Amino acid sequence: TPLYQLIHEILKNKEDKTKINLLFGNKTPSDILLKSEFDNLAKQHPDQFKVQYFVDKADKGFDGKVGYIDKDVLKSVLKGPSPTSHVFICGPPGVYKSVSGPKGPKGAQGDLSGILAELGYDKTQVFKF
């Protein structure tokens, strides 16, 4: 995930107090890339970094959630738009369509639509990887 590098850089800088909530969706628990790394970062920085895993199908013992990252999930995690809040999106086209609107051609960000637009975010607060 491209967000791993960003999260890692923020957390290793002791001066940076940015709070991060990672919502990580996958088909199954075995598809979760860098899970142990994210779990370790969450343990090392409990006041600054939180991670929640979402899967379509769970194995026994899975400690995350089964289902999609939908409007209710985003409303419960995001505190709403503010001048200092930013949302970073990475995923397949269906995720972009639902959450933020599709990316534009040749890597352009494209217009903001979907759940984040409904929640009041503007395109300066959302970055699509």
For the regions a protein language model found, what residue spans apply to each?
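Histidine-anchored nucleotide/phosphate-binding helix
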Residues: 2-14
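Reductase modules of NAD(P)H-dependent flavoproteins
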Residues: 18-129
